[in-house]
Amino acid sequence: MSEPTGDVRTLVEHIAKLLVDAPDEVLVYQVEENGETIIELEVAPADMGKAIGKHGRTVRALRSLVNAAGFRLNKRFELEILE
């Protein structure tokens, strides 16, 4: 059985690849820091706007999904987009 935090990373990666024009350039890292798991999303510079969305709606929705998954797992997650 896979580690639950890895499932959250995989979820973010899958959704991000569906949103952007260059899915092969999507990278997702997972960092444990101060008792929380930070999911770092990196996309091609040309796809940054698609990852963030109009007025930040897309990234806000992704963060909501990550937080909901963390709530179910009793774990704290944070999503960051790397430039």
Stretches found by the model and what they are:
Residues 1-48, 65-83:
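RNA-contacting regions in translation and RNA-metabolism proteins
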Residues 26, 53, 62:
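Residue-level signature of catalytic and energy-coupling elements of molecular machines
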Residues 48, 52-55:
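Short glycine-rich loop/turn motifs that provide flexible caps or phosphate-binding loops at active sites
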Residues 58-59:
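An amphipathic, aromatic/His-enriched active-site/gating alpha helix that lines ligand/cofactor pockets
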